[in-house]
Amino acid sequence: MAATQGASDVLSIGKVDFLKLQNGSDIRGVAIAGVEGEPVNLTELVAEAIAAAFAAWLLNKKKADGLRRLRISVGHDSRISAHKLQNAVTHGITAVGHDVLQFGLASTPAMFNSTLTEDAIHHCPADGGIMITASHLPYNRNGFKFFTSDGGLNKTDIKDILERASRIYEESARCGKQEQTGVVTHVDYMSIYASDLVQAVRKSAGNKEKPLEGLHIVVDAGNGAGGFFVDKVLKPLGAVTDGSQFLEPDGLFPNHIPNPEDKAAMEAITQAVLNNKADLGIIFDTDVDRSAAVDSSGRELNRNRLIALMSAIVLEEHPGTTVVTDSVTSDGLTVFIEKKLGGKHHRFKRGYKNVIDEAIRLNSTGEESHLAMETSGHGALKENHWLDDGAYMMVKLLNKLAGARTLNPNIGSKVLTDLAEGLEEAAVTVEIRLKIDQNHADLKGGSFRDYGESILKHLESVISKDPNLHKAPKNHEGVRVSGYGGWFLLRLSLHDPVLPLNIEVILSSLFFQLSNLRKHQSIKTKLTIMSYVHAGTKQG
């Protein structure tokens, strides 16, 4: 079960820059060799050190003395490096005297739930949880997400853990590996988690045993960890699930990228709905913290449309509440939430943790918020401990469907589609990622971040001279501009030397009007923001 490398193996690897493994509030790295230019940096020994560091961090957070024995849950998605990293993480924790609950194949939301569940038979609650996943990234990548009963860890926590891991790693190189003293217990936690989802739907339908009976729902798990939703959630609720696809875990992801934002993935679930004449289609990402849906006509319920749908459900339950979203949501969504639903739209930054933390902050100031969502498919609700849970979000849709069917047994997914009726949607949506050449003379030895900020300031100057363009008066990220029947947002990536440019227009003909603004030159880039818009017309 434990990794078998000795101290000499550690010494042969040399120095490891642990901080380079940080990806915001997650850890990401290359775990499998074979891709040119991508050397392995998430080895079993590195994983052991990170796991031991998390245990030390957790012990400190709980203000427990060194004699306290922690219980940490460990789960993984379908990646081909999952088992070796699970064993390494297990050894890292048990070698420092703490116990491990091994869940095996699991979803990210389930790992957080395990810190809340009161179930002595299944050894819960856990003091903390580790999910081994790299979301929708290629097969050679992997990583970790960490949880306590307070939710997912933040960037500062991750930095602390990686600094601890670096010291532990160096110490193990000098002293060799420690013997395992903690206890490992295998737990079927996904059955507990799925049972909670089933009970939530039954409750919404007046405790009817099979509230989805007669409905045909297909699921696309993308060969990730979401296949459980068919046998453990939908079938017990009475749904027909024939035509569901890619439910078997396969870390090579042979059919499509398990990502609700991916065009091929959405086409796959749409085709499954149409081919099987299903009432509803559901698609998950690899670790089930994101999701999207498709109605019976093949209409995609994702991005702005899914946020509109969830907003309608939540605002019906909590009138006037604030909906927090990421920065690239549409102007039409703002109008829909505020004018049609009577809520408040608070557009914030990209990054699911940023959006969730902002909703939590608003509540702490007295501004009620019950929903935080990203266009990527991350969605978190106050009622669900602010966990971004793709399965729970789909359960909210099923609750609405099941509740409506108690009044009209023949009703289908149109009841969901109708909730987003009136949302003004873009004819053209484009994202172009503009890379900053860090060797360009214009940088003059400075950082890409300083250079990117100077481009944003220059853009503001350009916008102020055009009466047809209007900068958003309140914006938390980048420069957002409306005009010519659409809007665009230019922002600086959180981690990479990239300026993502998002553009939306209501009518495709107006896209070309917007693209004709190429006269506005950017001194810094020698290109124009609007010529990128023009380039986008060729891509779209």
Predicted regions and their residues:
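Eukaryotic N-terminal low-complexity, Ser/Thr- and Lys/Arg-rich leader segments
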Residues: 1-20, 35-38, 65-66, 172, ...
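Phosphate-binding and adjacent anionic-ligand microenvironments
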Residues: 280, 318-502, 507-540
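Conserved phosphate/anionic-ligand binding catalytic regions in large, soluble enzymes, centered on
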Residues: 19-36, 221, 371-375, 384-390
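N-terminal small/polar loop signature for handling phosphorylated ligands or for N-terminal nucleophile
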Residues: 56, 60-141, 232-294, 360
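Gly/Ser/Thr-enriched, mixed-charge loops and adjacent short helices
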Residues: 14, 122-123, 140-276
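An N-terminal, well-structured beta->alpha segment
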Residues: 1-91, 95, 122-123, 183-213, ...
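Buried hydrophobic positions in well-ordered alpha/beta secondary-structure cores of metabolic enzymes
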Residues: 26, 74, 111, 130, ...
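Proline/glycine-rich low-complexity loops and linkers
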Residues: 94, 103-108, 159-195, 199, ...
